[in-house]
Amino acid sequence: GSEMCIRDRLLAVVAFYLAFECLDWLSTRRIPFSEARFGRVWRVAHAVLSRHPFAGPFLVLMIAWAPTLIASLPGLFMGDTGAQIRQWFNYPNGTSDYLRLLNPNVLLNGHHPVVHTAIIGSCVQLGLSVFNSANAGLAIYTCAQFVITAACMAYSISSLRKFGVSMPVRGVALLFFAFMPMFSNYAALLTKDVFFADAFLVLLVQTVKLVACGLPRRDANAERVGEPRPVLFARHDWLLLVLGALGSTFLRNGGLVFPLAACVIAAAFCAWDAHAAHRAAKQDSAASTLRVPRLRWVGILAVLALCLVSNLSLIHI
């Protein structure tokens, strides 16, 4: 036992040493990733990561994760999964046995996020109604979660391009997500944590986008001359910010703290951008540069107010 422990520790130390040596070697001997040098490999990577920055990674993830989905159907259960399903159908479950319920005849409670319990319970109910099979309902939920998780991961990779991250780094990130079994297994896991992680990832990306709007940007996106520079925060990004904030709020008990922190941080940066734009407008006698940071600041406060009001409404229900 002790010999195996010592061996494992030595192997871990050697592995960390070799990993950092490899990183040092890559930093000193950087090979430019260009079309002239790599030809077909560069064109494939460019098509997947730059010409189709969202659809390309999304298809790669769906194809790479498909064997896990097929092997896992109707889904991988956690300890809480059965309890949530039984709650939705008002059957006795592990939480109803020890919680002091407001109404003993209503076993649905807030031990698990009620919104997620409603989602997975509704899918099972749909499977029973349409296909007369609870497994069919679980498969519907698993497939929907699988697609949404792949879409969120693909969106995070596509957003790296807007942040000026080079194509090789985005390619390595995509391959890591595609072939690390943890992510494909997680996408087929029937638990409340998966949808929350998806929503939190979108919220995190949108918050970084808002913060980065006022920062100088590296122009590392144009792999070919004449390519348009991507817009960092477009109109549809507000919808994604709302979805990420609401998802983080309702898919985790106490999850309101995450959009609260994100909106406060983003609002502080946007307020600073508005202050800087106001000073620049005084010097240049132009008010147009002041309008955009102020609108972003107001939009962030509106998203925060929406999360607060909707959370209070759910509590009263």
Which residues make up each language-model segment?
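Conserved small/polar residues in nucleotide/adenosyl-binding loops
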Residues: E3-R9, H316-I317
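Membrane-proximal lumenal/periplasmic loop motifs of glycosylation machinery
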Residues: T68-M78, F89-T149, L189
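Juxtamembrane membrane-water interface segments immediately following transmembrane helices
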Residues: T68, S72-F89, P293-I315
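Transmembrane-helix motifs of polytopic, lipid-linked glycan transferases
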Residues: I140-G164, V202
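Transmembrane-helix signature of polytopic, membrane-embedded enzymes
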Residues: H52-G56, S156-F179, A197-D198
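Multi-pass, polyprenyl lipid-linked donor-dependent membrane glycosyltransferases
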Residues: M78-G82, Y141-A144, V172-T207, G247-V264
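Specific aromatic-rich, kink-prone transmembrane helix
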Residues: F89, Y155, F195-R218, A245, ...
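Membrane-interface alpha helices of multi-pass inner-membrane proteins
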Residues: D237-N253, A302-S310
